[in-house]
Curated annotation (Swiss-Prot):
Gene: atpF
Subunit structure: F-type ATPases have 2 components, F(1) - the catalytic core - and F(0) - the membrane proton channel. F(1) has five subunits: alpha(3), beta(3), gamma(1), delta(1), epsilon(1). F(0) has four main subunits: a(1), b(1), b'(1) and c(10-14). The alpha and beta chains form an alternating ring which encloses part of the gamma chain. F(1) is attached to F(0) by a central stalk formed by the gamma and epsilon chains, while a peripheral stalk is formed by the delta, b and b' chains.
Compartment(s) where it occurs, according to its Swiss-Prot or TrEMBL record: Plastid, Chloroplast thylakoid membrane
InterPro entries, alphabetized: ATP_synth_b/b'su_bac/chlpt (IPR002146)
Additional record remark: In plastids the F-type ATPase is also known as CF(1)CF(0).
Family affiliation: Belongs to the ATPase B chain family.
A GO molecular-function descriptor: proton-transporting ATP synthase activity, rotational mechanism
Cystine pairs: none
Name of this protein: ATP synthase subunit b, chloroplastic
Keyword Glycosyltransferase annotated: no
Annotated transmembrane regions: 27-49
GO cellular component: chloroplast thylakoid membrane; proton-transporting ATP synthase complex
Length: 184
């Protein structure tokens, strides 16, 4: 501590301006040099430091403002996305409900169509059976009639002889002749 006070006392006892002396006491000169350098730095560096701090403050302020703007935009986009999501979910629910009702309606239509087709097939089957029965009945009638005619023809052929045949033909010719005379 004595050295520091000695160095300040030395300042008062410096030689006049005409002479220049080097102070070789390093411990005494360093605090003086440091105080001078710090004084010069504070005096001249105050403006630079102030400008640097102002610039840094402005950059930080702009960064904060940009961050707030980005945050607001992100919030808006999030709200829009949530609104779109709600809309899509609503549409999906509507499509799901409509889809289920459409499936039920199609199912009922298909069941109705199947029942209608089954009824038509049943009607076609019954018509085919009726038609086949009529055809079989007609065939049976034709055969019975054919057999009856063959039996009657056979009976007539066995009962008719030539004389009876000639008499029948003559009687029929006579009937035709009388009918002809009446018409004239």
């Amino acid at each position: 501590m004595k050295n520091i006070t000695d160095s300040f006392l030395c300042l008062g006892s410096w030689p006049s301006a005409g002479s220049f002396v080097f102070n070789t006491d390093i411990l005494a000169t360093n605090p003086i040099n440091l105080s001078v350098v710090l004084g010069v730095l504070v005096f001249f560096g105050k403006g630079v430091l102030s400008d640097l701090l102002d610039n840094r403050k402005q950059k930080i302020w702009r960064t904060i403002q940009n961050s707030e703007e980005l945050q607001e935009e992100a919030i808006e986009q999030l709200e829009k996305a949530q609104a779109r999501l709600r809309k899509v979910e609503t549409e999906a629910d509507r499509f799901r409900v409509n889809g289920y009702s459409e499936i039920k309606r199609e199912k009922l239509n298909l069941i109705h169509s199947i029942y209608t087709t089954l009824e038509q097939l049943e009607n076609y089957k019954n018509e085919a059976i009726d038609f086949e029965q009529q055809r079989v009945i007609n065939q049976v009638r034709q055969r019975v009639l054919q057999q009856a005619l063959q039996g009657a023809l056979g009976t007539l052929n066995s009962c008719l002889n030539n004389e009876l045949h000639l008499r029948t033909v003559s009687a029929n010719i006579g009937m035709f002749g009388t009918m002809k005379e009446k018409n004239n």
